[in-house]
Amino acid sequence: SQGARRFSEVIPQALLALAPELRRRLSVVQQCRAEDLDAVRQIYGQANIQAETATFFTDMPARLAAAHLVIARSGAGTVSELAMVGRPSVLVPYAYATDDHQSRNAEVLSSAGGAWLLPEAELDVPVLSGHLAKLMTDPDMLRDAAKAAHGRAQPNAAAQLAELVLTLAAGELSGRAAA
């Protein structure tokens, strides 16, 4: 995905920086660019972190549903999926997204307490590792964030959008008929 190289550089190192007793609890699924796979796998292997890495996962909905925490970009689809499955997340908006729309997407969940927004400029090993250690030692934070994320879900969004479009179209058509 866009900017995934930064994730490949920071996330494995941040997990490596965790205390050994925390690292032993990890089961990581990380999507990487093809050119980053070997380096990422090597770090996880050296740290004895159980990890599955690939350039693409076909079963992402199931993986999201099984996750205790997701670290991701904050595209609209990702944010919607996280809300629907009620998963807490650390969202790192893509710094070069048009009109910084990913920051606004992330704020939908972070303002509700369902995610932690981490600007890309602040994404580094000590910051991420410290945040993850805090979350791993306070499971209530993850549980509360999961509930908050799910509270932002809009399961009928497609139907509501279709209804709005039809309403607007009907108004436009009746306006043309009157003219």
Where is each model-derived feature located?
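Donor-nucleotide binding loops and adjacent catalytic segments primarily
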Residues: S1-V70, S103-E107, S111, L118-V127
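Short glycine-/small-residue-rich Rossmann-like dinucleotide-binding loops
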Residues: R33, S74-A76, P93
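Short alpha-helical segment that forms part of, or immediately flanks, the ligand-binding pocket
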Residues: P61, V79-R87, E107
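Acidic donor-binding loop of glycosyltransferase active sites
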Residues: A65-V79, R87-P88
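Short hydrophobic beta-strand element within catalytic cores of glycosyltransferases
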Residues: A72, P88-D99
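C-terminal "capping" alpha-helix adjacent to the active site of nucleotide-linked donor transferases
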Residues: W116-P119, L123-D140
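A short, well-ordered alpha-helix in the C-terminal region of glycosyltransferases
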Residues: M141-P155
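C-terminal alpha-helical cap of glycosyltransferases
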Residues: Q154-A179
